[in-house]
Amino acid sequence: MRRLLGVRTGVARVIHSILLEWQRLPIPFDEVRLLTPRPLPAGLIPPHPKFREVVVGPDVPGLLWEQLVLPARVRDLDVLLAPSDTMPMLAPWKRVVMMYAYSPEMAASFPWSARVRWEPFARNAARNGDAIIVSSRNILETLEQGLEVQVPRERVHYAPLAADARFHPRPPGDPELADALERYGVAGAPYILFVGKLSRRRHIPELLTAFREVSAEVPHRLLLAGPNLLQLDIDGLIAELGLQGRALYRGFVPDGDVPLLYAGADLFVLASEGEGFSLTTLEAMQSGVPVITLDRPNMIEVTEGAAHLVPDGRAETLAGALRTVLGDAGLHADLRRRGLERTSALTWSAMAQRSLDVLWSVATGN
């Protein structure tokens, strides 16, 4: 549960959604222990008769806690759910690992030092986990390519992710929506949205340049939201492109505001060379927002014909896509409709039930 202690981005939101859904499902286990290096935030996980929070100290950096502290301090488990790509290499219990996409393109976007620290543990999990849960076959293939490992197929289980119920269309007069748009500086005009970590593979400079190319043709603003882990000079680039007041970078957005920013957007753009079963794309579609993304296997699988796909993340390509979608009301409405249809087929309830079934099967040997 370490991921729930910090900023709740992708994996933390997956864990949180699964735990909330488990509370609504029949749990075959006598007890579900939430192992954490320090107490979870108050109220994050509602009380449940089978849930028990267990603080396992000392609180040391992530992989050290997972690899050394957990195996030394925790003994009497039937099965461990490791929710984020790695698991304790030496442990007395069975282990189920949730793994996400890690393509060669994604690998190249991370610092070499981080890859050296992380990849051996992920490779071990892929080879030796008692069961591996992934969102799709394409995710599995990209994971194998990025880690240069073959995952035993008999241990693989598929469980697609979903957007949670907080993400939905809202009427223009919604007071919560109006307040959020005012606070983030996008009230009074339509806007294009990007949500996610700012990384090399997501073509943020190219998106800004593309927006400059079309900014005289549309009334929209561009809103970028997400942690700037690479320390890109976004404000400097915005100034260089002459987009002050039209392009806005808001950094990390509190979890409660994210659904509102989606609901108010006129278009969502994720021009990424490597993604998993993209939660941000699902959240945008479920909010009734048309999506532009790259024509890559994982994104094709996630969107299933419900997004406007482009071949690359060059500025001229993205500018053309912006003109196409924003300039064609019929296409815009059709993408909105198809996105809502696609996400209606994906639920956290199904994903949570599948993960519970896998855990029970591994624990009991059935």
Predicted regions and their residues:
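Carbohydrate transferase catalytic cores enriched for Leloir-type hexosyltransferases
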Residues: 1-366
